[in-house]
Amino acid sequence: MSGTKPDILWAPHQVDRFVVCDSELSLYHVESAVNSELKAGSLRLSEDSAATLLSINSDTPYMKCVAWYLNYDPECLLAVGQANGRVVLTSLGQDHNSKFKDLIGKEFVPKHARQCNTLAWNPLDSNWLAAGLDKHRADFSVLIWDICSKYTPDIVPMEKVRLSAGEAETTLLVTKPLYELGQNDASLSLCWLPRDQKLLLAGMHRNLAIFDLRNTSQKMFVNTKAVQGVTVDPYFHDRVASFYEGQVAIWDLRKFEKPVLTLTEQPKPLTKVAWCPTRTGLLATLTRDSNIIRLYDMQHTPTPIGDETEPTIIERSVQPCDNYIASFAWHPTSQNRMIVVTPNRTMSDFTVFERISLAWSPITSLMWACGRHLYECAEEESDNSLEKDIATKMRLRALSRYGLDTEQVWRNHILAGNEDPQLKSLWYTLHFMKQYTEDNDQKSPGNKGSLVYAGIKSIVKSSLGMVESSRHNWSGLDKQTDIQNLNEERILALQLCGWIKKGTDVDVGPFLNSLVQEGEWERAAAVALFNLDIRRAIQILNEGASSEKGDLNLNVVAMALSGYTDEKNSLWREMCSTLRLQLNNPYLCVMFAFLTSEAGAYDGVLYENKVAVRDRVAFACKFLGDAQLNKYIEKLTNEMKEAGNLEGILLTGLTKDGVDLMESYVDRTGDVQTASYCMLQGSPLDVLKDERVQYWIENYRNLLDAWRFWHKRAEFDIHRSKLDPSSKPLAQVFVSCNFCGKSISYSCSSVPHQGRGFSQYGVSGSPTKSKVTSCPGCRKPLPRCALCLINMGTPVSSCPGGSKSDEKVDLSKDKKLAQFNNWFTWCHNCRHGGHAGHMLSWFRDHAECPVSACTCKCMQLDTTGNLVPAETVQP
């Protein structure tokens, strides 16, 4: 310690004690602030802690440096270096009854008096104490003392014997050090290297020197001015820090020629540097007359690539107090905690808080790291907000194989949870499109298959000017209404809407029966009414009222329908026009809107947004002329595209308009899963190549990867390759011929010709078992199997030779002809190999290559070696 500025030290093994050193030694006990408030004389260190003075030691004047004994016992033994070069062992009144009490008061005296600059206890051999002294031309500057050595014999003059304070016994001085190092030079700083108790790093006058006590005549050194405050990183023993003036040098002892990193501080000189004992690669520095401590985080420092490459660091500054800081000390166990002391002995307990790093997992778990602690955010609210998140929904749908049912396409909405009416409409639309495309292809290939997937908008446009209306009688009423004659295109539109089945029959009876079975009484009654069957509508409403979950008010509605009259000025029409606005069910509203509207003016039905789009479109196809229908479909399509409503796929189909609609849907919901499966269902090639479609598909694939759904990702890729052959990836691995370099698998997987069928890597599955034993390109023979000695490509036979367990190689006929058994298999180290089936059989009982004179341990070169049972491996 220089001047009167105090220094501070934490006890190495007593985490609640520290000592302040200046002209005397003061021992403090740290406790929580709540308890310390009850004691007089406590000093507040922070909001949570306070210090109580335990003892003061004033027996060692002229202190220049202090080092706390590193062992557990004795607890409060300190070495004090004095201005005359002596090192005194003292305590703070805690060890008078200890078995080590003879150590207290012991002095270690150099031959020539000069200032002691630094002290360092050996962390491995705790009895060794290194002292660094100023230069003397006739003496060494680094002395290593053994504190357990006996006192000096008779050659010591009696005048050097003194009485210990408070004791009658005499304690003799020790003048013979264990080692003497560094002649004709000053030692400014010392530290032992933890990797070896015999290695000592010393900051001499103009160099850093590493002394090996096993051979003290030699030393390794490097010339530098940064010789002060040498300290070893406790987590990386080859990394050392030292300083000079305003610069900090970071050294790597494995490359000791020059610093690996130089940190430039402020113009003011440094007074202390210290590695954090609880945090990897965190270095704290303090400059003179400053209230700021700078921290350098070298945890993320990359390894230098070239001689001139300096690693990057993360730098930050902390201000523990407002006054100038004289010294600081890291707490030995509490994370990132330090205590600072000012020149007037004001102390502050301070914790350096880490930068918080957030991590949000793909399954919506939120965690953050703060130092050693890892916290997980748990949702305590019961609003099921997590279940409503689209990522959670997509993940659950992926587990249920949503979108992969290509036979009964409509079932995909059930796999999605059967909760979203838009998804239900979408998958029923795609189901009808697939169904009627197949039906049209069977009737007249190439006729209307592509038109079906183009949507009702394109279908309606193809029949403009071809439809006329005619008057039709009501069922149950003496009335006639104009209905458009259904041509082929309008019938197809009604089929896509689900009102009628495929074929020439236009009866909506089956559709009504399905609605009744699902309990959609109001919708079924409305569809029956739109088909001029008021009697069937009343019957359905009565059935709904009498059902278990039915609404009794349906009887009232049925009664109102039964009183229908065609007179424009009747009381019935007036009352229904008023009361329909008070009905909650949209289908009941449109029923009365239809009955009270004028011929051709059906806006009350067509623009009721709560009615399903497919029902409104089907209604329009029955009652609107070509011009009105086209105008209505165009307007409705634009509304669906802007809103991103999946029901609009019925209108747009899987066309560019459909991509625009789906883009709005994805922007609104983020559901790339539905967008991907929908576009793959039947879109033409130009639509599949759209950048937006490819973007949704790739993002969904990335989502499956992020969720670690590897099998689901594979299923999706297979599903995609079936519906979009152009997306099938090229082979990433193939076997090439040693002579011509051409791929063997390319020719083997080609279409069979002239009665010779080749399957990939060998034999076909045909009963003839065609053989491929040569390269299809140059006709050179393929390599031979190391076990059966037959050219590769032939059908695998049972493994030749005896085995320790015949049942292990007794392959069934199915396994003998399995394609995997014929694959080319070889070791990347020795290049020997053979049929996969033979290799698996061999390595069940052996670890060494089957080729004679080859000692390669093929199966133990990678993790696949773990597949071989240890008890079956031959030594």
UniProtKB/Swiss-Prot annotation:
List, in alphabetical order, the GO biological process terms annotated in this UniProt record. cellular response to amino acid starvation; cellular response to nutrient levels; central nervous system myelin formation; oligodendrocyte differentiation; oligodendrocyte progenitor proliferation; positive regulation of TORC1 signaling; protein-containing complex localization
| Localization annotation | Lysosome membrane
Give the UniProt keywords, A-Z. Answer: Lysosome, Membrane, Metal-binding, Phosphoprotein, Repeat, WD repeat, Zinc, Zinc-finger
Keyword field contains DNA damage: no
GO CC annotations, alphabetized: cell junction; cytosol; GATOR2 complex; lysosomal membrane; nucleoplasm
Query: Which chain positions lie within coiled-coil regions?
Result: none
Subunit description: Component of the GATOR2 subcomplex, composed of MIOS, SEC13, SEH1L, WDR24 and WDR59. The GATOR2 complex interacts with CASTOR1 and CASTOR2; the interaction is negatively regulated by arginine. CASTOR1 and CASTOR2 convey leucine availability via direct interaction with MIOS. The GATOR2 complex interacts with SESN1, SESN2 and SESN3; the interaction is negatively regulated by amino acids.
Q: Give the originating organism.
A: Mus musculus
* Superkingdom of origin organism: Eukaryota
Phosphoserine PTM positions = 759, 766
Tissue expression profile of the protein: Widely expressed. In brain, expressed in neurons and glia (oligodendrocytes and astrocytes), with more abundance in neurons.
Q: Where are the zinc fingers (RING-type)?
A: 782-863
| Stated name of the protein | GATOR2 complex protein MIOS
Query: Which Pfam families does the UniProt record give?
Result: MIOS_a-sol (PF21719), MIOS_WD40 (PF21720), zinc_ribbon_16 (PF17034)
The function of this protein is: As a component of the GATOR2 complex, functions as an activator of the amino acid-sensing branch of the mTORC1 signaling pathway. The GATOR2 complex indirectly activates mTORC1 through the inhibition of the GATOR1 subcomplex. GATOR2 probably acts as an E3 ubiquitin-protein ligase toward GATOR1. In the presence of abundant amino acids, the GATOR2 complex mediates ubiquitination of the NPRL2 core component of the GATOR1 complex, leading to GATOR1 inactivation. In the absence of amino acids, GATOR2 is inhibited, activating the GATOR1 complex.
> What Gene Ontology molecular function terms does this protein carry?
zinc ion binding
Top-level taxonomy: Eukaryota, Metazoa, Chordata, Craniata, Vertebrata
InterPro entries on file: MIOS/Sea4, MIOS_a-sol, WD40/YVTN_repeat-like_dom_sf, WD40_repeat_dom_sf, WD40_rpt, Zn_ribbon_mio
Which chain segments does UniProt annotate as zinc-finger regions (C4-type)?
735-781
Activity regulation behaviour: The GATOR2 complex is negatively regulated by the upstream amino acid sensors CASTOR1 and SESN2, which sequester the GATOR2 complex in absence of amino acids. In the presence of abundant amino acids, GATOR2 is released from CASTOR1 and SESN2 and activated.
Family the UniProt entry places it in = Belongs to the WD repeat mio family.
**What are the binding positions for Zn(2+) 2 in this chain?**
788, 835, 838
Which residues, if any, are the signal sequence?
none
- SMART domains, alphabetically? WD40
Describe what happens without this gene.
Answer: Embryonic lethality around 9 dpc. Conditional deletion in neural stem cells specifically impairs the formation of myelinating oligodendrocytes, thus brain myelination, without effecting the formation of neurons and astrocytes.
